[in-house]
Regions:
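Extracytoplasmic/secreted envelope proteins and their assembly/folding machinery
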Residues: 47-50, 57-68, 102, 106, ...
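Structured C-terminal subdomain patch of bacterial secreted/periplasmic proteins
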Residues: 28, 147, 155, 164, ...
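His/Asp/Glu-enriched short active-site or ligand-binding loop at hydrolase and phosphoryl-transfer sites
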Residues: 82, 209-229
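Short, solvent-exposed loop/turn elements at domain surfaces
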Residues: 44-46, 61-66, 80-83, 197-203, ...
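Short helix-initiation/N-cap motifs at beta->coil->alpha
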Residues: 39-41, 92-103, 226-237
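Extracytoplasmic ligand-binding site segments that recognize negatively charged/polar headgroups
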Residues: 120-124, 136-152, 186-211, 258
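Bacterial Sec-exported substrate-binding components of ABC uptake systems
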Residues: 2-59, 160-192, 252, 306-316
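A short, structured surface patch at a secondary-structure boundary
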Residues: 55-108, 112-118, 217-220
Length: 316
């Protein structure tokens, strides 16, 4: 009997040891770092299961929040879509996209900071790394970048199932929207991005240019000699006159009415514009800032529907 009791005791101790070991290994695995490559090509070591993520730009946070991810810090922005405003309203702000507050970021004790490839975020890499906090920079310049971001943020949030469902929904809508885009129609398009300092033409390396190409447009900016791998190149009236686009679409930084009026005044006053087909046929459109000034993320299909309507008069 004593031997039996002793045997049972040994088994209990062994099982307890096993479960404690398994629990410890699981905890170690959860806290272990994984190596990923961000949009700048940098190797970043991030927690396998980050729990306290701070976002520095609205586009990345929108995708993360759309699959149910919970952030501990967010940028100050007026560009959030209505469907996530409620879920993020109580998240502490860490400053505008162009002026992130490092002290505020660190006060939130993040185990991961997510930004985009702009100087104001790149310059945070060293001070964050010195504090033991990884910085992951994620650029969204195309439809494919949106899908990849959904996958990546699904892993970060531990919500792979929700991410897969969101991706499948977008891919289904994309297929339905593009299935009747026929070769041969190929409207010639010019997309102008206006800022307080300059007017630029969007190439296929920009988000708007990528969407236009997927909808069958011929983007005249891609024919420019100085395009290389640039997302935007300076607006050249001689080039526009030579290429003679059928459609002009305008994007203004922050939806600025002043910039839009400056663009339209230029079209009225510069005689070169008067012979451009898009102007002669009244096919100059302003793209909504909420979908084009800031990357629309999971609302990309809404942006494509508007472009398709302007290009073909249909958005099925």
């Amino acid at each position: 009997m004593k031997k039996y009791i002793l045997l049972v005791f040994v088994v209990i101790i062994a099982l307890a040891g096993y479960f404690l070991l398994a629990r410890g290994q699981h905890k170690l695995a959860a806290n272990a770092a994984v190596s990923v490559t961000d949009s700048t090509g940098a190797k970043v070591h991030i927690p396998a299961e980050p729990k306290r993520i701070v976002f520095l730009n609205a586009s990345n946070l929108e995708i993360f929040a759309s699959i149910g991810g919970k952030a501990v810090g967010r940028p100050t922005s007026t560009s959030y879509p209505d469907d996530i405003k409620e879920s993020i309203k109580d998240i502490p702000e860490v400053g505008m996209i162009h002026a992130p507050n490092l002290e505020k970021i660190m006060s939130l004790k993040p185990d991961l900071v997510v930004g985009t490839n702009v100087p104001f975020h790149v310059m945070l890499r060293k001070p964050l790394e010195m504090a033991g906090v990884p910085l992951y920079l994620n650029m969204i310049n195309s439809y494919e970048d949106v899908l990849k971001s959904i996958d990546d943020f699904g892993r970060f949030a531990g919500r792979e199932k929700e991410a897969a469902a969101k991706r499948a929904q977008i891919e289904k809508e994309y297929a339905a929207l593009t299935q009747d885009v026929q070769k041969g129609r190929d409207p010639k398009v010019l997309i102008i991005f206006g800022s307080p300092d300059s007017f630029n033409m969007s190439t296929k390396k920009s988000f708007g240019g990528d969407l236009a190409e997927r909808l069958g447009a011929v983007n005249i900016a891609d024919k420019a000699e100085n395009v290389k791998d640039s997302s935007y190149i300076p607006l050249s009236m001689e080039f526009v006159a030579k290429e003679n686009p059928d459609i002009v679409m305008l994007i203004t930084m922050g939806g600025s009415k002043e910039i839009l009026e400056k663009l339209r005044a230029n079209m009225r006053d510069n005689a070169i514009w008067h012979d451009v087909n898009a102007v002669k046929n009244n096919r100059v459109y302003q793209l909504p800032p909420s979908l084009f000034t800031v990357n629309p993320g999971t609302h990309t299909i809404d942006a494509m529907k508007i472009m398709k309507e302007y290009m073909y008069g249909e958005a099925k």
